[in-house]
Amino acid sequence: MLKKLVAGTLVAGFALTVGLGVASAEEKSNTIKSFDYLKVDEQNVNSLTKVSDQDKKDIQITMVLPEQNENGDWLAYGFTSRETLDAYIEKDKKALKNKINPLGSGAGSTDFYEHKDKGGQYIYWSSGFKNLPSSWNDRISSVSTASPSASYSTTLWEHTSTQGYGKGVVFKHADWYGKTANLAADWNDITSAIDVKK
């Protein structure tokens, strides 16, 4: 589906810019393809009771950790609802309150790119929920998170809020700052809403 880009339009804090960065070899290996769930709704999943295909269908939101298992699956926490994710985030923010060490005064915004490895045009968002404008709907292919001193996490939503959000994938800034997450087929070019939590 052909998307029209309206040049020069700023939408609620979005800035449309051309990204010219070159990605390192480490960033190129951060393609998010599949998950190995360690916890679902804060309940541990052990090696004997791996998450079944049916249980995976119940997982609505995945928090991706910056580590992979021996098969290349990304370690992750699963959540069956926005409420269980929000409860986890509130607990985790309290635990991290005095443990976040900023990497500098820099990036207070998460950058969303149209191509992998921070390629092509990008938009940035600093705080709060945003349904993407039509020019950016189903267009995001890679993410570079804000500093953990600026905000807690970035969530990509499959649908807009008026469409019920759909599935979500979360990147905690303390884990992902300084790295680029490339979105594989399951998430590439399907994001319709974003949320950067303080």
Model region roles, listed by residue range:
Residues L10, A25-K198:
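Compact beta-sheet-dominated domain cores in extracellular/mature segments
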